[in-house]
Regions:
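A short, N-terminal "cap"/entry segment at the start of jelly-roll beta-barrel domains
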Residues: 2-52, 90-91, 98-99, 131-144
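Short, conserved beta-strand element in jelly-roll/cupin
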Residues: 67-81
Length: 144
């Protein structure tokens, strides 16, 4: 009987945890973003991931930073890139390259303010085991 009570209690805790918001509820999730992984391989403690990322018109990456450097090229559409002080630090069009520094000091957001989909090819160079991006709260900007 004690085993049944413990199992019931465990099931209740698991069920309730599904209703509890995550600890990073103040983070700003992306919207309208899709990605296809082209390559994902670890070499010497560094994880290299190549992705094709599509952001729908009006979509964004959400506020975030990267544990490792990121390099990308716009293949279609237009990327508007903002720093954590809300300023636009670049508008990128097809054929233009973007590089993003790593770490908590480089919180940023990428937005598609155009009327057509934005497509980027992006290479992440991360420490193996780290996420590609870490979501953060909006730093106080009037958007997202």
């Amino acid at each position: 009987m004690r085993i049944i009570k413990r199992l019931a209690l465990g099931a209740a805790v698991v069920g309730l945890s599904a209703l509890t918001p995550p600890a990073v509820a103040s983070a700003t999730p992306g919207s309208g973003v899709g990605a296809v992984t082209i390559f994902d391989h670890v070499v010497g403690g560094t994880r290299y991931v190549l992705k094709e990322i599509t952001i729908a018109p009006g979509g964004s990456t959400g506020w975030h930073y990267h544990p490792g450097p990121v390099k990308g090229v716009v293949t279609k559409g237009e990327l508007t890139h903002h720093e954590s002080d809300c300023s636009v630090d670049g508008v990128y069009r097809p054929g233009q390259f973007i590089t993003e520094s790593s770490g908590t000091g480089y919180v940023h957001i990428g937005r598609n303010l155009a009327t057509t989909p934005l497509v980027l090819t992006v290479l992440y160079e991360n420490p193996a085991g780290d996420p590609l991006a870490v979501s953060t709260p909006n730093p106080g900007c009037a958007f997202e």
